[in-house]
Amino acid sequence: MSSASRNILVTCALPYANGSIHLGHMLEHVQADIWVRFQRMRGHNIHFICADDAHGTPIMLKAQQLGITPEEMIAAVSQEHQTDFAGFKISFDNYHSTHSDENRYFSELIYTKLKDNGFIKSKTISQLYDPEKNMFLPDRFVKGTCPKCKAVDQYGDNCEVCGATYSPTELINPKSAVSGATPVMKETEHFFFDLPQFADMLQAWTTSGALQEEISNKLNEWFTSGLHQWDITRDAPYFGFEIPGAPGKFFYVWLDAPIGYMGSFKNLCDKRGDIDFDAFWSQNSDAELYHFIGKDIVYFHSLFWPAMLDGAGFRKPSNIFVHGYVTVNGAKMSKSRGTFIKASTYLQHLDPECLRYYYAAKLNNRIDDLDLNLDDFVARVNSDVVNKLVNLASRTAGFITKRLDGKLADTLSEPALYATFTSASERIAEAYENREFSRAIREIMALADEANRYVDEKAPWVIAKQEGQEAELSAVCSTTLNLFRVLMTYLKPVMPELAARAEAFLNVTLNWNDIEQPLLAHNVAPFKALFNRIDPVKVTAMVDASKEEQQTAAPKATGPLADEPIAPEITYDDFAKLDLRIALIKKAEAVPEADKLLRLQLDLGGEVRQVFAGIKSAYSPEQLEGKLTVMVANLAPRKMRFGMSEGMVLAAGPGGKDLFILEPNAGAKPGMRVK
């Protein structure tokens, strides 16, 4: 039986609001959902929340590419995410967004408290700046070589190879991920969270049992090398919350992202009206707070986040449950191989409970990576769920409904066997509690094997053919369905939809604490198929569909490319016919008789050409004189009523004031050919 009711708040890491959910994300959400459903079955008061992480430069830039506002983009992504999670039966009590009034309130509150308590420092720093885009570059928009392990193509905040964290200015050979330009250094004032002040508290907390041993050991390396102040500022332009009293400065996304847990929970409290927010977040709270996260974001959750909470007068997490990555067929998820599978693609082809079961069968409480082997996935689900579990009901239910009026026996013929199944309750509960889901599944399937041995030994299909054996037939089938009920109760956190169909058939709710009493003289419903085998053809179709999605995944062009698509393909010989030359604009003057034309005198380095250009709406003559430009030098002269035009200058833009003549590098000389 379960112990006294506990008050528990569970969160999953917040998915970033600029892309789709894939099967790697889904591991964490399935893991947390199984644990939450188990706790609900045990009678505990548990709240399960999440939100979209909706701030940052990546979202701002992607929205620009799509030609929409960041608010429009994150609203659409949130709807997509929630649809995917619902499809996989993730039972959130609330799903919110970090771009919310609640999150702004708590972000400003925590920042203000940290500042008032002396934990926020201000200093002028030199930061990487994109000279082409005229913007400071956030960590994730600088890429280069890791200063620690020398791995190439790493982001500006942490290395995905060795796990080191660093400043973007420490990268070797940095490049802007926005334009590809080499960044320059530029000074700006930033605010820092003084993490070193929390070193003693964090060292004690991280070794208190609040983290897995592997994580605690890893964090010890960072304590050994010393903690550093954390830059919590980003410069405009930025999509996020402006820092109070600091115009043009914004909270770094990793400051307000974990605060999103509080924002989402406050949103739930306000909607429900019967939940006390402070009972879960105050410093003296005795409620339990658990974060399920991936191993790639341990540093933020196990150092910055508890320090922020402590410094602002809130409670720290009870535990942080860290999992590994998902590989597919023994390798990193691959777009080209079709193993980078979106949740929505999976749902178009397969039952989500198949993946829930497979993940559960392989999950433990360590941070090992989990391999989704697609052949094993098919074999295990078909063998365990269909052949072993559902088969128990399908082999015996028909006899109950057709021969025994749909009613189970009024006594249990095998009480010792039944006791074997119910006595496993606490072992399986302990496995669920400790997130040893694979151990729970092994226990359940071992019992399923025992139940099938019982059915094989008793052979109800043989008994059914014998005259006067209705009592024996009833005893065997009733025992089998009672064993099936116990097994389905144990599996309910993993496969809630299958459990719901079993409940409809058994005509009873599957409650953990009810299994001690078997179903006697109980009516069941006519049996319907409970679960379908996985067809390997559907798995292949899912992989093929993922390949096709990647081939067409490039976002639809917006802006100039969409307005004027690329012209039909030409050959190199076609291009070679064009003679493009650098030209110096010696003189420019308006053509009084024409609204759009300027008369240009172009020096080709020994020859001067007269060209009429329709750029009067964008340039005055004074702006052009002395500039280098590019002209088509071998275009046939064209006689106009103002004179002869002996070529064409090149310009870009839709027209009007938005016309831009091409200006080559200052090193180019008049007369040079462009090739």
From Swiss-Prot:
Span(s) of short sequence motif 'HIGH' region: 15-25
Subunit text: Homodimer.
EC number: 6.1.1.10
Taxonomic lineage: Bacteria, Pseudomonadati, Pseudomonadota, Gammaproteobacteria, Aeromonadales
Superkingdom of source: Bacteria
Gene behind the chain: metG
Sites where the protein binds Zn(2+): 146, 149, 159, 162
InterPro entries xrefs: aa-tRNA-synth_I_CS (IPR001412), Anticodon_Met (IPR041872), Met-tRNA-synth_bsu_C (IPR004495), Met-tRNA_ligase_1 (IPR023458), Met-tRNA_synth (IPR014758), Methionyl/Leucyl_tRNA_Synth (IPR015413), MetRS_core (IPR033911), MetRS_Zn (IPR029038)
Manner of cofactor binding, per the entry note: Binds 1 zinc ion per subunit.
Membrane-spanning segments: none
GO MF, any single term: tRNA binding
Catalysis performed (reactions): tRNA(Met) + L-methionine + ATP = L-methionyl-tRNA(Met) + AMP + diphosphate
Residue positions of motif 'KMSKS' region: 332-336
Protein's recorded name: Methionine--tRNA ligase
Function text: Is required not only for elongation of protein synthesis but also for the initiation of all mRNA translation through initiator tRNA(fMet) aminoacylation.
